[in-house]
Structures are given as C-alpha cells and as structure tokens.
Amino acid sequence: MFGSDNRADYDNGFPWHPHRGIETITYQIKGKTFHEDSEGHRGIIAPGEIQWMTAGSGIFHEEMPKPIYYGEENKYRERNDSNAGIQLWLNMPASSKMADPAYRSIRSDQIPQISDDYGNRIRIVAGTVNRVSGALNENFQYDLMQRIDPYYVEILMEPDTRTSLSVPEGHRAIMAIVEGSIRVNGSTFNEKNVAVLSKEGTDIFIDSQANSRLIFLAGKPLNEPIAWYGPIVMNTRDQLIQAFNELQEGKFVKNRNPVWQ
C-alpha cells in the first residue's frame, strides 16, 4: 500500500526502474499517478482505476504520483492534495516469465459493481462474485488468467453491516483492510491489517465495525520455486544473475512492441 497526505512523501514518486517475471496491479484510491514505460506507453491512473501491467521478459517504467501537466489542453493540471493506492505483485508461472510485456488500463466505469442486502458495494476487478464477472475477465482474457484464476475484489462497507464471500476451491486468499475495522469469521482486523484466509473453498463472513474499505485477493498457487531480488522475480538464482547481468549490459528489454490493451 502507498499513501500519504504529505506532499514531500509522494512527490518523489517511483522513478524509472525495471521489472521481470511478474505482473504489477496498481489500484488508485486518492489522487492521480502518472505512468510511463520503456515502450513509450503513458497514462494517468485516476481514483477507482486499475493499471494491470505484465512485465514478462522485461520492462522499465516509472510511477509518479505528483501534479501532472499532461497534453496540450492541460487536462490534468489540478494538483493532488493527497495520494493513496495499492500495488500488488502477481508472480508469473515459469512458462510465462519471459512472455511479451503488456499494459492494461481499466477505467472505473469498466469495473462491475454490485450491492448486497445491507447496501455494501462490491467492485469486481477480477474473478466472479454472485455470477458477475470482473472487468479483467470480460475485457482482457489471456493465458495467465486460466492458470492463476485471479480474484481482485474491493468491498466498501457501511458500519454495523455484514457481507460474505467464498474462497474459490483450490485458491489461496488474503484480505487487506485498507480503511476501517472488521471481524472476519469472529476475528478482529483493523486498518492496514491483512487476514490470511483458508484455501478450502470456505465461506467468509465479514462484519464491519466502521466505514471500511477491503481488498479481497485470491489465486491458484503455482507451487513453483521463487528466486526474488528487488524488482525481479524468477525461479532460480541463475535466472536472477542473468537478469542483472542483462541490466548492466543494456540487454534487459527483449521486446520493443508489447501489447497495448
């Protein structure tokens, strides 16, 4: 999670850096973040929007949550008074780690939203809830979706209400409490806590104790070795060494024409 109301904390942003072997999923809650990558793609992530980037074989990018002057009409001239969001790293299977990079921009109005009996709002970025498919499932089907079957669901709860979800069979799941306080199957979790949930297809009952914002994340485990250092996640130490050698030699980016979606 990233978030601050102090401009000095986020004006520096996240300057140019590499990734390989993962997908980065950035969800903007407050403020705006400017993204640009080594393939020439650029855009603004506004509140309620998602950027789902496949680093694959290698990409450089920067994420700059600061005042932005973008385009001839200066459409984004306003200054951000605060900035908050969540970035998730999704490990790619060994067979996909050297895939071509891709960039997916998901607008807020592309994310399906449903309400439960208490009026709690459930936004479905990926996965299926109450037979409603998420934005990623509807707009961006690709091979990795079938392998991992990711769930990315935001829940906005009113105080003293209840909602429920099911952990899909065979999935590992966590729930991040971004704001508020909740009880999950009888256990209390507060702001910035993370609840690790069962992988046995169980139902989860969530009781809110305040206005709460939750992120439910789930996926099928890969059961593969992980070799991780800094922004690069591979399967073996030799692959990591190769990646950092390629960084020094200027050979890191393999594909200059990634998929823009």
Curated annotation (Swiss-Prot):
EC number: 1.13.11.24
Pfam families membership: Pirin (PF02678), Pirin_C (PF05726)
Reactions listed under catalytic activity: quercetin + O2 = 2-(3,4-dihydroxybenzoyloxy)-4,6-dihydroxybenzoate + CO
Cofactors that this protein relies on: a divalent metal cation
Gene Ontology molecular function: any one: metal ion binding
Pathway per the UniProt entry: Flavonoid metabolism; quercetin degradation
Cofactor note: Binds 1 divalent metal cation.
Gene3D superfamilies membership: Jelly Rolls (2.60.120.10)
Alphabetic keyword roster: Dioxygenase, Metal-binding, Oxidoreductase
Classification via InterPro entries: Pirin, Pirin_C_dom, Pirin_N_dom, RmlC-like_jellyroll, RmlC_Cupin_sf
Record function comment: Putative quercetin 2,3-dioxygenase.
Family note: Belongs to the pirin family.
UniProt xrefs under PANTHER family: PIRIN (PTHR13903:SF8), PIRIN-RELATED (PTHR13903)
Protein name: Putative quercetin 2,3-dioxygenase Ta0133
The organism of origin for this protein: Thermoplasma acidophilum (strain ATCC 25905 / DSM 1728 / JCM 9062 / NBRC 15155 / AMRC-C165)
